Regions:
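Conserved acidic carboxylate
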Residues: 15
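Receiver (REC) domain active-site loop signature in two-component systems and cognate sites
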Residues: 62
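Active-site residues of response regulator receiver
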Residues: 59
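Non-catalytic signal-transmission and effector/linker regions of two-component phosphorelay proteins
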Residues: 1-10, 114-125
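Alpha4 helix (beta4-alpha4-beta5 surface) of REC/receiver domains from two-component response regulators
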Residues: 69, 91-110, 116, 120
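Charged docking surfaces used in two-component/phosphorelay signaling
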Residues: 19-30
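Acidic catalytic/metal-coordinating carboxylates
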Residues: 39-43, 66-72
Length: 125
């Protein structure tokens, strides 16, 4: 059953791992959010050019265009949505990833994450 109050909020999931994208889509849709998935940052750019999203859930490491490049593009072209980004990343954080996350001040989820962790963080934003 969908949760009331989230029907008008749209979320773009930017994730190259199909299973994770589907999991996030299922959880967020169940809570009443309108959800779309982009398989990489380049596809996300195209979707952001055509549509409006209230929040982005962005994987840091992806082929074609990763989350770091997408975030830099957002800051230049879509600063409003750049403020409402949650990053996801694998459990092994290299120094470069830690530096990036620290510089953005954005929240992030370590994979694998639970549905409760995902919804809890989304609702905070």
């Amino acid at each position: 059953m969908k949760k009331p109050g989230n029907e008008e909020k749209s979320i773009l999931i930017v994730e190259d791992e199909s299973a994770i994208g589907k999991f996030c889509h299922r959880v967020l849709s169940k809570h009443g959010f309108k959800v779309n998935i982009a398989g990489n940052g380049k596809i996300a750019q195209q979707m952001l050019e055509k549509g409006k999203y209230d929040l982005l859930l962005v994987d840091i490491r992806m082929p074609v265009m990763d989350g770091v490049e997408l975030y830099r593009w957002l800051n230049k072209k879509r600063p409003q949505i750049a403020r409402r980004v949650i990053f996801t990343t694998g459990s092994v954080l290299g120094q470069e990833t830690l530096n990036f996350l620290g510089s953005t001040g954005k929240p992030f989820l370590l994979k694998p994450f639970s549905s409760d962790e995902l919804i809890g963080l989304v609702k905070k934003l």
